[in-house]
Regions:
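Metal-dependent polysaccharide deacetylase catalytic core of the NodB/CE4 family, i.e.
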Residues: 43, 113-270, 301-304
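Glycine-rich, phosphate-binding/catalytic loops in enzymes
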Residues: 109-112, 281-282
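C-terminal active-site subregion of NodB/CE4 polysaccharide deacetylases
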Residues: 1-94, 101, 139, 218-219, ...
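Short acidic, Gly/Ser-rich segments with clustered Asp/Glu that frequently serve as metal-coordination loops
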Residues: 97-104, 109
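Alpha-helical segments flanking ligand/cofactor-binding loops in enzyme cores
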Residues: 108, 214, 276-277
Length: 331
């Protein structure tokens, strides 16, 4: 883990130096490639205090304008059908989570540049108005609490605003918890959440409603896919619960969209063979990951890994890394 992080930081530093030395054209030289991009949230300023999942509206528009001008940006369906162009970067765009800010900021920009995208929705609406990950990120940052107890374990707040027990963050522990236990986190931080001015923070947790999801599903540029029901790590909860989460999200979205939902993105990118084959059984034709578990998995045409957007680097660096297909490699 430490070696991977070091290579990542070294790779970005290397590109930064090259840009400053005037080698930007070399770094941005077009080349053949195939990448599905993964965005999460878009906000007004690119806030990273709460998480590493949001980029600013200005960054997003600059990025979309650049890639739509210089490369071949295609729909996810066309990407799966390998409708690629030679000697250029071929890109499909996806969003995970179902944030309202996608509807507010991303959709108008994508429409402006006529860029297709797929939105993967977490159907938690019947249980909570937010994803537990966002709730925990925001209250952990703002709470005055320094210690809390969850499942008889004592967590201490560190300088990074994370609650830690036994060198493990509460967020990592929570990924594997059943939802009824996750609801205990809501109760622990209930007063902290209610003390937050909602308008100031709503961009970081509010989700699209059914009408907005349906509007995107009906748009000729866009498609809707499923992303689970509660954003649990499906490989860490009991297998039958995981399957029910997948099925529920499909049924709920098909009810909203009035059309088949055939795309599924695994929360956190975590998957296993049994869950992947279950997705196929119930009608999902395209499965989106982050990284493949094995080299053999990369040979499955229905499974695709994705290139996660980095909110900490410039647009030029992001494009350079995308062209190279890595955050750690040089030119």
């Amino acid at each position: 883990m430490h070696w991977t992080r070091f290579k990542y930081q070294l790779g970005l530093f290397y590109k930064t130096v090259l840009f400053k030395l005037g080698f930007g054209k070399l770094l941005l030289k077009n080349r053949y490639g195939e990448h599905i991009l993964l965005f999460h949230g878009i906000d007004a300023v690119g806030e990273t205090n709460y998480n590493d999942r949001f980029v600013s509206k200005a960054f997003f528009e600059e990025f979309i304008q650049y890639i739509s001008t210089h490369y071949n940006v295609i729909s996810l369906n066309n990407f799966y059908q390998k409708k690629f162009k030679k000697d250029t970067l071929n890109i499909a765009i996806t969003f995970d989570g179902g944030y309202l800010n996608n509807y507010k900021y991303a959709v108008p920009i994508l429409e402006k540049y006529n860029v297709p995208a797929s939105f993967f929705i977490t159907t938690i609406h019947g249980k909570a108005p937010y994803l537990w990950t966002d709730f925990l990120d925001i209250v952990s940052y703002h709470t005055d609490k320094t210690e809390i107890i969850l499942e008889r374990n004592l967590y201490h707040k560190n300088e990074q605003h994370e609650f830690i027990w036994n060198d493990i963050s509460m967020k990592n522990v929570a990924k594997a918890l059943p939802y009824d236990v996750l609801e205990m986190i809501y109760k622990i931080f209930k007063d902290d959440w209610e003390a937050l001015p909602p308008i100031k923070y709503e961009e970081y947790w509010m989700l699209m409603n059914a009408q907005q999801i349906k509007e995107i599903a009906d748009h000729p540029l866009f498609t809707i896919g499923a992303h689970g029901e509660t954003h649990a790590s499906l490989v860490d909860i009991p297998i039958e619960e995981a399957k029910q989460e997948i099925l529920n999200s499909k049924i709920q979205l098909e009810t909203i969209c009035k059309q088949p939902i055939t795309e599924f993105a695994f929360p956190f990118g975590f998957y296993n063979q049994e869950l992947a084959y279950y997705c196929k059984e119930i009608g999902f034709e395209q499965l989106l990951l982050v990284d493949y578990n094995t080299k053999n998995d990369a040979q499955n045409d229905k499974w695709k890994n994705r290139f996660v957007i980095n909110p900490y680097i410039s647009m030029e660096q992001q494009v350079a890394c995308l062209l190279k297909g890595s955050y750690t490699k040089g030119i």
